[in-house]
Amino acid sequence: MAKVNIKPLEDKLLVQIVEAETTTASGLVIPDTAKEKPQEATVVAVGPGRTDENGKRVPMDVAEGDVVIFSKYGGTEIKYAGEEYLILSQRDVLAVVEK
């Protein structure tokens, strides 16, 4: 994963989608029309966290390199330097995949 010159603001994350499998365990090819929208991504960059009502930063629950599962319809798709990314709010992240 290459370093990206995009720094998310507040409680935003920049993630790169983990591509879904194109074949089943038995070797059948899954056509694009039957694939579900992926919900797993690798965190590329993390914002500093939102500011609470007292002006203090609330730390982020995820870090660069984490693999996360996110809400199916969350985020904004962007293209940068020929790569596709998604900008998510921390609230769109449902879980961190433990290694």
Swiss-Prot record:
Primary role: Together with the chaperonin GroEL, plays an essential role in assisting protein folding. The GroEL-GroES system forms a nano-cage that allows encapsulation of the non-native substrate proteins and provides a physical environment optimized to promote and accelerate protein folding. GroES binds to the apical surface of the GroEL ring, thereby capping the opening of the GroEL channel.
Q: Does the keyword Protease apply?
A: no
Transmembrane residues, as ranges?
A: none
Q: Just give the chief location class.
A: cytoplasm
Does Lyase count among this protein's keywords? Answer: no
The similarity comment for this entry is: Belongs to the GroES chaperonin family.
- MF (Gene Ontology): ATP binding; metal ion binding; protein folding chaperone; protein-folding chaperone binding; unfolded protein binding
Subcellular localization(s) per the UniProt record: Cytoplasm
Q: What is the lineage of its organism?
A: Bacteria, Bacillati, Actinomycetota, Actinomycetes, Mycobacteriales
Pfam families per the UniProt record, alphabetical = Cpn10
Q: What is this protein called?
A: Co-chaperonin GroES
Q: Which InterPro entries match?
A: Chaperonin_GroES, Chaperonin_GroES_sf, Chaprnonin_Cpn10_CS, GroES-like_sf
Any S-S bridges, and between which cysteines? none
Record Gene3D superfamilies:
GroES chaperonin
Q: Cross-referenced PANTHER family, in alphabetical order? A: 10 KDA HEAT SHOCK PROTEIN, CO-CHAPERONIN GROES
Q: Which UniProt keywords apply?
A: Chaperone, Cytoplasm
Describe, as the record does, how this protein assembles with itself and its partners.
Heptamer of 7 subunits arranged in a ring. Interacts with the chaperonin GroEL.
List the NCBIfam families hit by this protein, alphabetically: PRK00364.1-6, PRK00364.2-2, PRK00364.2-4, PRK00364.2-5
Q: Name one GO cellular component term.
A: cytoplasm
Q: Name the Gene Ontology biological process terms.
A: chaperone cofactor-dependent protein refolding
